[in-house]
Curated annotation (Swiss-Prot):
A Gene Ontology cellular-component term: beta-galactosidase complex
GO biological process, one term: lactose catabolic process
Upper classification of the organism: Bacteria, Pseudomonadati, Pseudomonadota, Gammaproteobacteria, Vibrionales
Annotated protein name in UniProt: Beta-galactosidase
Reaction catalysed by this enzyme: Hydrolysis of terminal non-reducing beta-D-galactose residues in beta-D-galactosides
Positions with a binding annotation for Mg(2+) 1: 413, 415, 458
Cofactor(s) named in the record: Mg(2+); Na(+)
Active site per UniProt: 458, 534
HAMAP family given in the database record: Beta_gal
Xref: Gene3D superfamilies: 2.70.98.10, Galactose-binding domain-like (2.60.120.260), Glycosidases (3.20.20.80), Immunoglobulins (2.60.40.10)
E.C. no: 3.2.1.23
Residues annotated as binding substrate: 100, 198, 458, 534-537, 601, 1006
Protein species of origin: Vibrio vulnificus (strain CMCP6)
Domain of life per record: Bacteria
Length: 1032
């Protein structure tokens, strides 16, 4: 018996050779069905969940633990209870720590801090004498970061690797009746040096704990390899079954579709019997093959699954137990420089996904997983990378079932190590590396959804990677291996897998330069496909120029897509002292080593509501595209392209609508039937009389006819909008004949009134500002319209993701140096004159900062008797200024009601920015004031709508060619707030009207990533806006 003091002295948690002790060999998940029909139907598995309330106590370090807690008679009455699975930091113990690169402790591998929070767990399990006739194994699916296990006071073993199962044989330690399990979990171990992923550091038993009962003679593992013939028509299964049984025992395999057998039973006996060093029989291996003519193929589009039942029979043919696995017939290969599935080159519409729950941390329920998968499919994702570790076992089963391609990634990242490859090249760590990779492959090898293995993430490149790669190609040559480290194109990867390489621009400020992806595939002797393991960093208001990636993917066959970073904002639910909810990020728990909001870079919020960026991703990744080929006044010819590689559009309907000046005037629908990977032409009959100078658009929505497993009937899978030519002539111009309004100058006041006194404007000639604007005595604004050059910085503007200090090249730093947002305004001149039909008030402003004039603007107001004001703004900027955030104006309007409707004719309905508007459609949109604001967890500028021609807010209508946003928050408040609960909604509406607005960027979030064509580099701008009463 191993004493507790010996375990403390041995310090397995600081020894990279002690990966696991007494753990059973990794294998595919086992269920031990005692009936073949049960195995076929997946019912009555011999698995007992040990999830529930366990006794718990947290100690400061392993040395502080009372070793008697392992004993059955230990009095734990004063201990707390904690749910298993859970992370103890989210149950009121210890604190979460978020870091992207930095280790949250001093780097001195393999040693960890002496201050090493240690959670001790206890639970009791009752077993009958009949239970003890079988072997009993306990499986911990995930424990962070390392643990020792005791059963009835006897030490059982040790394990680390937070993201893979640890399985122990408890049979010899159990008794009939009540049994006590005790677990000691350390927050830090040497394995923590290999788990430096961009996520929260959380601890505890956070995945399921299961007791598996198996007969003495049993199936230990099954390895299934599906194959397709050269024509990708007929299929076969290679099945390797490992058993612990006498040589006279047999293995039967049979394939089912539902309850129907599709092959005859195949029975075989073991081969290659060996006697091990203990003089006993070693595991026996049985090789079998099944053939099936023209099986239904598995793809993400058509996730057809069969079920293989593998049964152990004794020498008399008596059934002992069965295991069963879903089977998908598919073939993954790289040929002609492309990653192919069933002979077709894939286009990876992928996303990186962390296992994150806003209340439960790293605990994921099946409902959470299904919700994520359905959202992914609804937004046109077909692939997921398990960034950066093996996921919960159930995740892969659901990906098999619903249809997602999976890049399965080993739990290895040493991002904070200097150099990054330090441990990757160290033979002392080779066993730890190999264990993490091989055990992942051994667990997950039978899932058809897994089409790529990944050696890990951001660990440089070293001999340990080469060893993993070599083992993988030998053990499972049916799947390619990818790895980004060391330049994305080392000999340890079958796929060029860069992160954040750009479409056309060289990223040269890296240790290893990242070529433009278009150039990368044309480098000499480079024949591999390129799939970005990470791209389009979706941090906050981001994803600018995403459509450029997809244009390149569709143009160049060896550019085969990528995985967006990333799926979900890793915010944790918290409440402030006033009971107001907010999403917490790094530093909010007193974690001094942190990377702030860099964990907030998802396409969806923590509660799974969607960001506007997800709309752009959905559009660019759509599987069905529609383009306008021909147009007459009576008809349009559309080209419909089905980018699905394996399925006809047999459940899709094309709904179309004709818009006149943003309003629908005609609709129609047509069922689609387009063969996989092909095109067809459709003719749409139009029945309308065009109006002079009206704008016409044809919208198409491709919708599901019937519900699927991942979306309801009517779900829109793809949209398109096409501008149509107007065949009508021009409209006759309207001449203004009304008299000019009345102009009065009184001291510093310039007052303009309509002749009926209904409309009145008043300027202060000293400030040059329009101080009052009344209609029927009712104020139209609360503060004067003013030039606006500032935006509350976006995460991409700040550019401080991986360093403590602001990069001087970051937009926010350049804007601060130029004083943008701090300029002093001086009125140079304010004058007025009466014309034949209008009064003109002209004001010139100079903006000063640092002793220099930074900008000069001239506002020319042309006022008509009917209450219309035409505003002409001329802007001249100093040559030394950096590209500007925006060119526009802001005015403050009264707030009449909280749900004030905002109606506009322009791009929408969701938020869009100049470099992120491919998904937006021109139309007449109405949303409430609240809907116009996007509550980014780290507050920034939000809510812009581009391509606007007309806008109504309250009783005010604005027309022109502009972009706008409305908000109850001042820009400065947004700039200063760190969380949404810091924002206090004002009793007014901030209306921002922009002539030009800089793009948001998003190739990455730590360098200035706004493309040049979306930067405001000109030094002269001029724009016009027309204001009028909405009731006019």
């Amino acid at each position: 018996m191993t004493a507790f003091s010996e375990i403390l002295q041995r310090r397995d948690w600081e020894n990279p050779q002690s990966v696991n002790i007494h753990c059973l060999k990794a294998h595919s998940p086992l269920a031990s069905f005692r009936d073949m029909a049960h195995a076929r139907d997946g019912i009555h598995a011999q698995r007992q969940s040990l999830n529930g309330q366990w006794k718990f106590k947290l100690f400061d370090a392993p040395e502080q633990v009372d070793g008697q807690f392992t004993q059955a008679d230990f009095n734990d009455a004063e201990w707390d209870e904690i749910p298993v699975p859970s992370n103890w930091q989210l149950q009121g113990y210890d604190k979460p720590i978020y870091a992207n690169i930095k280790y949250p402790f001093d780097v001195n591998p393999p040693f960890v801090p002496s201050d090493n929070p240690t959670g001790c767990y206890r639970t009791r399990v009752s077993l009958s004498p009949e239970d003890l006739l079988n072997t009993q194994r306990i499986i911990f699916d995930g424990v962070n970061s390392a643990f020792h296990l005791w059963c009835n006071g006897t030490w059982v073993g040790y394990s680390q690797d937070s993201r893979l199962p640890a399985e122990f044989d408890l049979t010899s330690h159990l008794v009939a009746g009540e049994n006590t399990l005790a677990v000691m979990v350390m927050r830090w171990c040497d394995g923590s040096y290999l788990e430096d992923q961009d996520m929260w550091w959380l601890s505890g038993i956070f995945r399921d704990v299961t007791l598996l009962s198996k007969p003495q003679h049993c199936i230990e593992d099954v390895f299934i390899t599906p194959e397709l013939d050269a024509c990708y028509r007929d299929g076969s299964l290679s099945i390797v079954t490992t058993i612990a049984a006498p040589e006279t025992y047999q293995v039967q395999v049979q394939l089912f579709e539902g309850t129907q057998a599709v092959t005859e039973p195949n029975i075989a006996r073991p081969h290659n019997r060996r006697i091990d060093e203990r003089g006993t029989w070693n595991d026996d291996v049985v090789f079998q093959t099944l053939h099936l003519r023209e099986p239904k193929k598995w793809t993400a589009e058509t996730p057809n699954l069969y079920r293989l039942v593998v049964s152990l029979l004794d020498e008399n043919g008596t059934h002992l137990e069965s295991e069963a696995y879903p089977v998908g017939f598919r073939k993954v290969e790289i040929s002609e420089g492309q990653l192919k599935l069933n002979g077709k080159p894939l286009l990876i519409r992928g996303v990186n996904r962390h296992e994150h729950h806003p209340e439960l941390g790293h605990v994921m329920t099946e409902e959470d997983m299904i919700r994520d998968i359905c959202l992914m499919k609804q937004y046109n994702f077909n692939a997921v990378r398990t960034a950066h570790y093996p996921n919960h076992p159930r995740w892969y089963e659901l990906c098999d079932q619903y249809g997602l391609y999976v890049c399965d990634e080993a739990n290895i990242e040493t991002h904070g190590m200097q150099p990054m490859s330090r441990l990757s090249s160290d033979p002392q760590w080779a066993h730890a590396y190999m264990s993490r990779y091989t055990q992942m492959v051994l667990r997950d090898k039978n899932h058809p959804s897994i089409i790529i293995w990944s050696l890990g993430n951001e660990s440089g490149h070293g001999s340990n990677h080469n060893a993993m790669y070599a083992w993988s190609k030998n053990f499972d040559p049916s799947r390619p291996v990818q790895y980004e480290g060391g330049g994305s194109n080392t000999t340890a990867t079958d796929i060029i897998a860069p992160m954040y390489a750009r479409v056309n621009t060289l990223v040269a400020d890296e240790a290893v330069p990242k070529w433009p992806i278009k150039k990368w595939i044309s480098l000499p002797n480079e024949t591999r496909p390129l799939i970005l393991c990470e791209y389009a960093h979706a941090m906050g208001n981001s994803l600018g120029s995403f459509d450029e990636y997809w244009a390149a993917f569709r143009e160049f066959p060896r550019l085969q897509g990528g995985f967006i970073w990333d799926w979900v904002d890793q915010g944790l639910s918290q409440w402030d002292e006033n009971g107001q909810h907010f999403w917490a990020y790094g530093g909010d728990f007193g974690d001094e080593i942190n990377d702030r909001q860099f964990c907030i870079n998802g396409l969806i919020f923590p509660d799974r509501t969607v960001h506007p960026t997800l709309q752009e991703a959905k559009y660019c990744q759509r599987m069905i595209t529609v383009s306008l080929q021909e147009q007459t006044q009576k008809a349009c010819t559309l080209l419909v392209t089905n980018e699905n590689l394996f399925r006809t559009t047999d459940n899709e309907q094309l709904n179309w609508s004709l818009l006149e000046n943003g309003q629908v005037i005609q609709t129609g629908s047509q069922v689609l039937s387009v063969e996989a990977d092909s095109q067809t032409r459709l003719e749409i009959a139009l029945n309308f009389t065009p109006k002079a100078q009206a704008q016409y658009y044809l919208n198409t929505d491709i919708c599901l006819i019937e519900a699927t497993s991942w979306a309801p009937a009517g779900h829109v899978v793809a949209t398109e909008q096409m501008a149509l030519r107007n065949h009508a002539g021009l409209a006759m111009p309207t001449l203004r004949t009304q008299p000019a309004p009345k102009l009065t100058e009184n001291g510093h006041a310039i007052v303009v009134s309509s002749l009926d006194e209904k409309h009145q404007w008043r300027w202060d000639s000293q400030s040059g500002l329009l101080m009052e604007w009344n209609v029927d005595g009712k104020a139209q604004m609360l503060a004067a319209p003013q030039d606006n050059f500032f935006r509350a910085p976006l995460d991409n503007d700040i550019g401080i993701s991986e360093v403590d200090n602001v990069d001087p090249n970051a937009w926010v730093c350049r804007w601060e140096m130029a004083g943008i947002g701090q300029w002093e305004r001086h009125c140079v001149q304010c004058e007025s004159e009466t014309l034949a039909h209008a009064v003109v008030v002209t004001t010139t402003f100079a903006y000063h900062f640092g002793g220099d004039v930074q900008a000069i603007t001239q506002w020319t107001h042309t006022l008509s008797n009917d209450g219309e004001m035409l505003l002409d703004v001329d802007v001249t900027l100093a040559d030394a200024l950096p590209p500007m955030p925006r060119i526009g104006l802001e005015l403050q309007l009264p707030l009449h009601q909280a749900d004030t409707p905002i109606t506009w004719q322009g791009l929408g309905p969701f938020e869009n920015y100049p470099d992120r508007l491919a998904a937006a459609r021109f139309g007449l949109h109405t949303q409430t004031l609240a809907q116009m604001h996007t509550p980014y967890i780290f507050p920034t500028d939000s809510g812009l709508r581009c391509g606007t021609q007309w806008l109504q807010v309250n009783e005010l209508a604005i027309s022109g060619d502009f972009q706008f946003s409305v908000s109850q928050y001042a820009q400065q408040q947004l700039a200063e707030a760190k969380h949404t609960h810091d924002l206090l909604a004002q009793e007014r509406i901030y209306l921002r009207l922009d002539h030009q607005h800089m793009g948001v960027g998003g190739d990455d979030s730590w360098s200035p990533s706004v493309h040049k064509e979306f930067q405001l580099t000109e030094k002269h701008y001029r724009y016009q806006l027309r204001f009028s009463p909405a009731s006019r």
